[in-house]
Amino acid sequence: MGNPGDRVSLGETWSREVHPDIDSERHSPSFSVERLTNILDGGIPNTELRRRVESLIQRDPVFNLKHLYFMTRDELYEDAVQKRFHLEKLAWSLGWSEDGPERIYADRVLAGYNNLNLHGIAMNAIRSLGSDEQIAKWGQLGKNFQIITTYAQTELGHGTYLQGLETEATYDATTQEFVIHSPTMTSIKWWPGDLGRTVTHAVVLAHLICLGARHGMHAFIVPIRSLEDHTPLPGITVGDIGPKMGFENIDNGFLRLNHVRVPRENMLSRFAEVLPDGTYQRLGTPQSNYLGMLVTRVQLLYKGFLPTLQKACTIAVRYAVIRHQSRLRPSDPEAKILEYQTQQQKLLPQLAVSYALHFMTTSLLQFFHSSYSDILKRDFSLLPELHALSTGMKAMSSDFCAQGTEICRRACGGHGYSKLSGLPTLVTQAIASCTYEGENTVLYLQVARFLMKSYLQAQVSPGSIPQKPLPQSVMYLATPRPARCPAQTAADFRCPEVYTTAWAYVSARLIRDATQHTQTLMRSGVDQYDAWNQTSVIHLQAAKAHCYFLTVRNFKEAVEKLDNEPEIQRVLQNLCDLYALNGILTNSGDFLHDGFLSGAQVDMARTAFLDLLPLIRKDAILLTDAFDFSDHCLNSALGCYDGHVYQRLFEWAQKSPANTQENPAYKKYIRPLMQSWKPKL
């Protein structure tokens, strides 16, 4: 499990002893926390490397996080830029590779607190969409920070709907340049991170126009600021968009382009190029230009969304064994709030979601790495499935993380509202993830289109026409299933085969219903686009069920592979059961709709769910310890490893500048008002 002393890293001298209420939770563990940590990390070497990197970060005073809660917006920005460049110097000195695990582990500690993350996203876009020559040129400049880049896609008037973007790139054959222009107010690029005050270049998404013909969205490298004095270049209007709900350290910006010229070579050209005379040549599918977004979404799953919920669970569960409230019996002392079933019902499903998403993300990463190299070689056969999986998992993961972090915050009562708990920061980070890199409803509907096509493909009679095999993730659509659930007792609902089959049945039924509703409208004469719009709510429901089914099935399969770890397999099986049953109870109407489940069976599922809560509660602290977040990484007064919540809250509050600075409002307003009443007293 590592050295517990390494986890208590915030410097309080009184924190060398662990609070007995949390210490008792770690006595006589039912499984090896250290071994589960190794499994989550993908092996002992990864755990050891991650801890070395985290220890390096935590010992460096530049990476101190404690003071951030008391900083102004400008101070947060400057501090985050300093952290990023200090990290780069550290990486260079230690020989870390650009895409190596060390940087991922460093980001795990500093997540949300270091700037220039969009520089990495823009570099990924260049590596995904650029030619070998462009990668050699721009990749090296970006790696050395000779240029600083952002990815400029979203506009004031459009975001997820890429075809609606208005920025134009018109090719001028006489000069062999592209003229990049924002033709309307709504075409101003809006929201790109680091654009407001920092970057020198942007990867700009714009509609390509050649010889009067439009060829869809393409990516262009556009200089934004002078490399000499950082002033905006001619034709560039750029700035900061102002305060936001969160991420106040990041200078999200706007960019207006007024006929800005860039060389022909600045269009990223792995999958399409414009010849000197203006002839357009496509070298891939139209969807291949979205590959940069796909890479970003996959990375966000394990670098952004998942750690946010894992941290929130760790904080809330630890606080729940320190906080005592009311009595279970009149003669008892006040109980830990985690003893209450209602608190377990709030927190333990979030813990189950954290583990379910971990194994789903691991599986998706494996599929991504196996197919990405083929896509770069212009083999696009797996691109539709990879797009559907990454899009669906982005939507579901960010939705669940946003919901889960807020549930964890509320479960901590009033103290959860304090920034010192660390939870408000996690909540605002998670909420933002539901709309950046694609608004989730739109993303679910993209998945739904893939599902409708797959369902129709699955219904084609064998041998009638040449048929491509169904993608692996939707092969279940062609598999017959019983029309009724066979479960007869609550214990039956703890059988993975029972609930996995139930989820497969309901997902397939919803996909079928959505498709048939759309087709019925079209047969009645409704235009296909109107028919889609009029059934989009049903399609949305089907896409969500499909994504949930995939995580249930994947979690089940991941647990089955742990036969050589029986203690860990047991506790993870409980979490898998809880995840599947919580989804069934939350969406019980879908399972009752056509009688697949009866009302009595839903009651059985609820009994099975409630029976799981005390079993998982016994291991809850150990399951959060297995995430192996240090105190530095959590930056939470409520969630520290030692459990000294109240001392830490009080000590941190003393650091507020309001406690040491003179109160100007007293002289200006309070004292004059109070003195005006003196003669009357």
UniProtKB/Swiss-Prot annotation:
Its EC number is 1.17.99.3. One of its GO terms (molecular function) is FAD binding. Acetylation of Lys-667 is observed in liver mitochondria from fasted mice but not from fed mice. A motif (Microbody targeting signal) lies at residues 679-681. Its cofactor is FAD. Its main location: other. It is found in: Peroxisome. Pfam families: ACOX, ACOX_C_alpha1, Acyl-CoA_ox_N. It is an enzyme of class 1 (oxidoreductase). GO terms for cellular component: cytosol; peroxisome. Residues 1-28 are annotated as: Disordered. Residues 14-28 have a biased composition (Basic and acidic residues). Keywords: Acetylation, FAD, Fatty acid metabolism, Flavoprotein, Lipid metabolism, Oxidoreductase, Peroxisome, Phosphoprotein. The modification Phosphoserine is found at residue 9. The modification Phosphothreonine is found at residue 13. The modification N6-succinyllysine is found at residues 66, 137, 303, 453, 561, 667. One of its GO terms (biological process) is bile acid biosynthetic process. Oxidizes the CoA esters of the bile acid intermediates di- and tri-hydroxycoprostanic acids. Capable of oxidizing short as well as long chain 2-methyl branched fatty acids. Homodimer. Belongs to the acyl-CoA oxidase family. This is Peroxisomal acyl-coenzyme A oxidase 2. It comes from Mus musculus.
